[in-house]
A protein has these predicted regions:
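Phosphate/dinucleotide-binding and metal-coordinating scaffold of catalytic cores
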Residues: 1-333
């Protein structure tokens, strides 16, 4: 139950998704989870294309870290509308799979019924807000970084990388050679001063580091090793989840997340996110289930990056091993 204190008469959030509203939130656990007593929160919208749909996705932030519905303590949580998902289960099934594969920091899902200013908005999926923090990507925000490769290209700190010339470019136009890369978390304007740097200086350090990883992926021979740059098990698990769910969003690319514990570490793929356009849904119900995840006609940078990764024999070998193990032990579940 969410009641806006500044607009108690509203039937829906209006304006920008980033507009924040004070609200009172409470939650009935219905015997399955602990009730959440009334408390003040900041309530706002979220999402990209889904924000413009009839059923709005939401986000709320509490004053202190709280364990909600059995999830780890955190301040911020998301309410996924699943408006284009007639099953209301695409995200839930995909994230279950990520947890089954023991992908670090995989999200959890709890179905909830949402009441907004007393109006029933229907079924939502309550989940962790992805970001650096104890409830999501639990790494040191002063040492690590969470990146997102996404054609929306709408974060404050971002750069585009040309996969063929191996250089950064000025714009993130979505084409076969360009990969739009963004800093998802933390807020560099808050972290950099504590490290004795400006936000731009800290951004440049990480931009160069991420670019070095991309260059390695694009230039290393298929028989070479990428273990110096990426955690290949995380890559394989990432592809298994997206392949089984037929999630073509990663090709565009959309919601393609990677993180690194520190500059001395390696990049890990995940947490996986956003399966609205998955399980053969591609703008219409009944799209062919055998549509290739990667083919020779891809016109987006995501295609090019994924093809380079999957051409690596080390990754392909582990992919086959983990796939066989999943078919034997996991698929029957």
């Amino acid at each position: 139950h969410v009641n806006l204190t500044d607009h108690p008469d509203w039937t829906e959030l209006t304006g920008s998704k980033s507009d924040e509203h004070p609200a009172i939130l409470r939650m009935d656990g219905n015997g399955m989870y602990d009730d959440l007593p009334e408390q003040e929160v900041i309530f706002r919208g979220r999402g990209n294309s889904t924000w413009n749909m009839k059923k709005k996705p939401y986000r709320f932030k509490m004053d202190k870290k709280t364990a909600v519905c059995g999830m780890k303590k955190a301040k911020s949580f998301a309410l996924i509308a699943n408006y284009i998902d007639c099953s209301l289960m695409r995200n839930t099934v995909a994230l279950w799979l990520a947890n089954y594969l023991e992908m670090p920091f995989a999200n959890h899902c709890v179905p909830v019924k949402v009441y907004f200013n007393g109006i029933c908005k229907g079924q939502y999926m309550l989940t962790e807000k992805t970001g650096i923090g104890s409830g999501s990507v639990d790494i040191d925000e002063e040492k690590g970084m969470l990146f997102e490769i996404d054609s929306n290209y709408d974060e404050d700190y971002k750069f585009a990388y040309d996969l063929y010339s191996h250089t950064t470019v000025q714009n993130g136009n979505n084409n076969q050679s360009t990969l739009p890369v963004m800093i998802a978390d933390p807020d560099l304007t808050e972290i950099a001063p504590a490290l004795g740097l400006t936000a731009d200086e800290y951004f440049d350090t990480w931009k160069n580091d991420f670019s070095a990883m991309l260059t390695a992926v694009m230039t290393t021979p298929s028989t070479g090793s990428l273990k110096e740059y990426i955690d290949i098990e995380s890559v394989v698990n990432f592809f298994i989840v997206n392949s089984l769910s037929s999630n073509h969003e990663m090709r565009h690319p959309k919601s393609f997340k990677l993180y690194k514990d520190s500059l001395d570490g390696v990049y890990k793929f995940g947490p996986v996110w956003d399966f609205d356009w998955a399980f053969t849904f591609d703008g219409r119900e009944g799209a062919p289930a055998n549509t290739p995840m990667v083919d020779n006609n891809g016109d987006c940078g995501g295609y090019t990056f994924i093809k380079a990764l999957l051409s690596n024999e080390e990754i392909r070998t582990l992919y086959q091993q983990k796939w066989n193990a999943f078919v034997k032990d996991g698929y029957p579940e």
